[in-house]
Amino acid sequence: MEKLYFDDTTYIWKTKLNLVEYKKLLLKEAIDVIESQPEVKSDGFGYKQEWKENLNFLGEIIINNKLDEVVKRGINCCKEIYKEKNIEYNKINTDAWVNLVRSNNPVQIQFKHDEMRGVDKYHTHTEINKKNKSFFPHYTYVYYIQMPDVMEGEDGVLYFRGENKKEYWIRPEEDDIIVMEGWMPHAPNNAPKSTIDRVVLAGNVGFEFIKKEKSLL
């Protein structure tokens, strides 16, 4: 993976998964996930959340469809990056979701009202998981299934906020997978003139070492 630096302490990793030929299938599977959860009024639609319940889960999954393949490869990207830390682990915690930024009537609050643009647009997955009493995510990956077809200025970009409070951005392309530290403040921008929505599959990955209790037998 390519490591892209915005400054000395602000960086992401990026590569291609070479799944462009499967875009229609990936999009169909993602839409199926969205349509299966009509009660969800936010922009995130949970996918295979049961993985985080498996104590012995080490990133090996049975691939039943293309979304599963993306999840598997997203986990592998995070494992590759974490390997550089040379820290032992025996459990991987993970979750995944389909994220939708609508070109028309987006549900994110910063797009609903002009006066809210730029206000509290950032989020971090360490904070989200803490509030949800879930695992600590070392990394978050995002795979871009579909990007807007009309983008002007900073439409469609992904914003990052560094430790120096400076704002940076990158405009992802379809088939990009981006990995960031779980604590990285980030925010997607919409593209109001686009005729199609931004659709991604994203996930958190956390590494843990669980001490095994010795049996008295």
Residue ranges and their predicted role:
Residues 87-190, 196-200, 204, 208-214:
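Catalytic core of non-heme Fe(II) oxygenases with the double-stranded beta-helix
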Residues 1-90, 97, 119:
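Non-heme Fe(II)/2-oxoglutarate
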